[in-house]
Curated annotation (Swiss-Prot):
UniProt cross-references to SUPFAM superfamilies, sorted A to Z: Aquaporin-like (SSF81338)
Name listed for the protein in its UniProt record: Aquaporin NIP3-3
Record PANTHER family: AQUAPORIN NIP2-1, AQUAPORIN NIP3-2
Topology class, membrane: Multi-pass membrane protein
Segments crossing the lipid bilayer: 70-90, 99-119, 141-163, 185-205, 213-233, 255-275
Similarity-based family: Belongs to the MIP/aquaporin (TC 1.A.8) family. NIP (TC 1.A.8.12) subfamily.
Lineage, highest ranks first: Eukaryota, Viridiplantae, Streptophyta, Embryophyta, Tracheophyta
Keywords assigned: Membrane, Repeat, Transmembrane, Transmembrane helix, Transport
Gene Ontology CC annotations of this record: membrane
Name of encoding gene: NIP3-3
């Protein structure tokens, strides 16, 4: 029962934040000059860059102070984890009223609204695995990685203790614990995190992607992954989600699986799309 309930878990998102305000001015200048130029005079490469910049203007944060970015990551992670854990607890307390589909929907909707709300501030990672992958491929300054991860973990821990205080005693089902063998659990978490980052990277970096649908696509991917992997591993995809619930309940069963498999899956998913991108 515990393994099944923990299967309705959380996730995260991410769009690479812009590094400097100067870069924003360059983008605006380039887009402005190219928009007034005769399309026939633009090379294919220039048109491609123009399309890319026009798409990015709506989703890449401008130069935002690091304090505001990490604050957005803290509050966003808190909202996400609080929503997911509360939904799981309601399902347990009311005889599976939510069901796996309901919990997956709750997590997917939470991710969707948070991406729409925070993407322009921090990129809305809410997940150390995403931040690590973004840093590895140069989309997040290395100096920002530790502050991002710290704020995400603190947000998840705070949300887990808030849930524990409100619904005490908390059922251990909120903890992500494998309901399959260790090797199987490792690869399940690796694969679903791979899926998540493959989609995020495609939408965030491909000029041909429909950028207005990023929030919906990422939320739908989270929902899909929970439906696929929830009953077997808890479908964490997010080290912060796993750490927060583990600390709040004092249960650390096979926690290393989630701390190792998810970052590796995130890096692999991002790398896979980078390799095939046109």
């Amino acid at each position: 029962m515990e393994g099944h309930k923990s299967g309705m878990e959380a996730v995260a998102v991410a769009i690479p934040p812009l590094h400097t305000g100067e870069s924003n001015h360059r983008i605006d200048s380039n887009v402005s000059s190219q928009c007034h130029a005769d399309p026939a005079e633009l090379s294919d490469e220039t048109q491609q860059q123009s399309l890319w910049h026009l798409g990015l203007r709506k989703i890449i944060p401008s130069s935002v102070p690091l304090l505001k970015k990490v604050s957005a990551e803290f509050f966003g992670t808190f909202i996400l984890i609080f929503t997911v854990l509360s939904t799981i607890i309601m399902d347990e307390q009311h005889k599976s009223i939510e069901t796996l589909l309901g919990i997956a929907t709750s997590a997917g909707l939470a991710v969707t609204v948070l991406v729409l709300s925070l993407i322009h501030i921090s990129g809305c990672h809410l997940n150390p695995a995403i931040s690590i992958a973004m840093a590895v491929f140069g989309h997040l300054p290395s100096a920002h990685l530790l502050p991002y991860i710290s704020s995400q973990i603190l947000g998840a821990v705070a949300a887990s203790f808030a849930v524990k205080g409100l619904y005490h005693p908390v059922n251990p089902g909120i903890v992500t614990v494998p309901n399959v063998g260790t090797v199987e659990a490792f690869f399940v978490e690796f694969i679903i995190t791979f899926f998540l980052l493959f989609i995020i990277t495609a939408l965030a970096t491909d000029p041909n992607a429909v950028k207005e649908l990023i929030a919906v696509a990422v939320g739908a991917t989270v929902m899909m992954n929970i439906l696929v992997a929830g009953p077997s591993t808890g479908a964490s995809m997010n080290p912060a989600r796993t750490i927060g619930a583990a600390i709040a309940t004092g249960r650390y069963t096979q926690i290393w699986v989630y701390l190792v498999a998810t970052p590796l899956g995130a890096i692999a998913g991002t790398g896979a799309y980078v390799a095939i991108k046109l």
